[in-house]
Amino acid sequence: MKKRVGILTSGGDCPGLNATIRGVAKALYARFGENVEIVGILNGYHGLITGEYKEMCEDDFRGILTLGGTILGTKRTPFKLMRVVEEDKIDKVAAMKKTYKDAKLDCLLCLGGNGTHKTANLLSQEGLNVIGLPKTIDNDIYGTDVTFGFHTAVDIATEVIDRIHTTAGSHSRVMCIEIMGNKAGWLTLYSGIAGGADIILLPEQPYDIDRVCEAVGRRAKRGSNFSIIAVAEGAMNVDEAKLKRKEWAAKRAEAGYTTATNRIAAAVQKKTGMETRVCIPGHMQRGGSPSAYDRVLATEFGSYAAKLVEVERYGVTVAMVNNRVVANRLEDIAGKTRNVPEGCELLTVARRMGVSLG
């Protein structure tokens, strides 16, 4: 009897999605041959809700190992709205279950980040056979040491910081580089250290703008005519850290900004007298071909997911723990975020190197 396996990619795109899809497909075909049928769900959970899917064949998975983005398309479908019936009067959960049934799926593989995993857990609790695969450049999925897409994004953000050094030095400027990472600062921490940033500001380490300016001033006194500040998009100051997320987000909206980077740049220029500029690489960090590391990781994850399909182990997500690929229960990781802990060795390394954390 043939197995029918559905695959979807949800949330923001990142390098390695196609490599993971390929890893799943090649491993399934190697194991089951003609006794497996793969169904591509288009545009993430949105396609599962609206019934958009297509039958796929081996040719669809050729030549995609190095390809950025996702051949299945993706859309953001917030978990908080999954049980909300909006103006279109669609019961999203019921619609997803219907598509699963209509497509005659034996299981569904969901590639995505934290929101994707929360919805995957919801579907698992609703009785569907679901397996998750951890995708995010933020590296913040609970229960796994690394997610595919992260290392490529580190390479990209590091190159941005590398290139900013020369223009900062040439113009005697302070450069604030905004790195993606709203709730977790892994990407900023890794790329900041790899790129030689002088100041690294993370969501987990609330900053004091006076300390930031003091760090810039110390460098100037030692003869450095520039400073590089790597700012996570979710960085917050010590006063904001005392508020609930919605409260400080509302205050920022009133002030006309969403991230701290422009405010930091303005304050540094005013307090130090040094010309300050902002660089936001933005979605460049999500784009392009995955690194060799991410291609290997994606292949490991994809092939392991195929093994889970073979043994019919569902309600889990793939993870890397202590250099071993394992499966974590969705209910154990859904809704949790892997933040940079205070005891993180890289924070210690940064401090030893004289890097200011704000």
Residue ranges and their predicted role:
Residues G33, L123-T147, V154, L202-D208:
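Short, acidic/small-residue loops that bind anionic groups at enzyme active sites
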Residues T99, C110-G112, A120-L122, F150-H171, ...:
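Accessory alpha-helical/coil subdomains and C-terminal extensions
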Residues M1-T9, T20-K104, G115, N237-K242, ...:
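A cross-family phosphate/adenosyl-ligand binding-site feature
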Residues T20-V24, N114-L128, T188:
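Short Gly/Thr/Asp-enriched flexible loops that form oxyanion-binding sites at enzyme active sites
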Residues F301-E310:
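Flexible loop/turn connectors
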Residues G12-P15, E87, N114, T144-T152, ...:
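Alpha-helix capping and helix-loop boundary segments enriched in small/acidic/polar residues
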Residues L8-T9, G40-L42, G73, C110-G112, ...:
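Short beta-strand segments
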